[in-house]
From Swiss-Prot:
HAMAP family xref list: TruA (MF_00171)
Residues where substrate binds: Y111
Name of the protein in question: tRNA pseudouridine synthase A
Isomerase among keywords: yes
Organism: Neorickettsia sennetsu (strain ATCC VR-367 / Miyayama) (Ehrlichia sennetsu)
Length: 243
């Protein structure tokens, strides 16, 4: 029997989604409690592995298990009871067709990146937003962001550890909204390269600060060293996954 689950979590304090030998991970916490509740070894398969410090509001994973006396809503309640101190919350579980795959059935992934643009440091939103103290040119950010939308070779916008066979991706959306001192980047695509969203944000901030050339020039270079810094993980949220 295959289950589809939606989970939210605060990435601070975790080594990321993926299970690690010597550091806590979201995957390990979920597999441990699900295995305990369902009385069998559970392995979860995720839509997209988030890095250390990255958060999720709508991460999706699937797992297989024998038929259980527990109903899906009971599994949700039990998991949340056991993980109440971990800042991991299971939002929903449902039984799905066995052809469903959290990663390969996905047609679009949506991310948000949050910046707090003010001079004073953060307290409440520390580790939930990137604090940028310098004044940013919002119009320039929005203008340059649109040059990233569409199908491009994003070689300049992936980390050196990226394992993808090529850097060609289609970015469906990259929009920026501002509400007071908060700036939110909305990015959507079927798939992203490793650190792509964070490098795009870091590059746009560098351009808006007058430190870098234009996005079109950076794309044409096809070299990571021409793009801006990788924005810190604390501002990135996996918002939802479409199927």
């Amino acid at each position: 029997m295959r289950y589809k689950a939606i989970v939210e979590y605060v990435g601070t304090g975790f080594s990321g989604w993926q299970k690690q030998m010597s550091a806590p991970s979201v995957q390990e916490e979920l597999e441990s409690v699900l295995s305990f509740l369902l009385k069998e070894k559970i392995a979860v398969n995720v839509a997209g592995r988030t890095d250390a410090g990255v958060h999720a509001l709508g991460q999706v994973f699937h797992f297989d298990a024998r038929e259980s006396t527990l109903q899906p809503f009971q599994i949700v309640n039990a998991v949340n009871y056991h993980l109440k101190e971990k800042l991991i919350v299971l939002l929903k579980i449902e039984i799905v067709d066995e052809t469903f795959d959290a990663r390969f059935s996905a047609i679009r992934r949506h991310y948000q990146y949050k910046i707090t643009n003010r001079k004073t440091p953060l307290a409440v939103f520390k580790n939930r937003s990137w604090h940028v103290p310098q004044t940013l040119n919002l119009d320039l950010i929005r203008e340059q962001a649109q040059y990233l939308v569409g199908k491009h070779d994003f070689q300049s916008f992936r980390s050196s550890k990226c394992g993808a066979s090529n850097a060609i991706r289609t970015l469906d959306r990259l929009e920026v909204e501002k509400n007071g001192e908060e700036m939110i980047f909305h990015a959507s695509a079927k798939s992203f390269l490793h650190h792509q969203v964070r490098i795009m944000v870091g590059t746009l901030v560098a351009i808006a600060s007058g430190k870098l050339m234009s996005v079109t020039e950076i794309l044409s270079k096809k070299n990571r060293r021409y793009a801006g810094p990788t924005a810190p993980p604390c501002g990135l949220y996996l918002l939802k996954v479409d199927y």
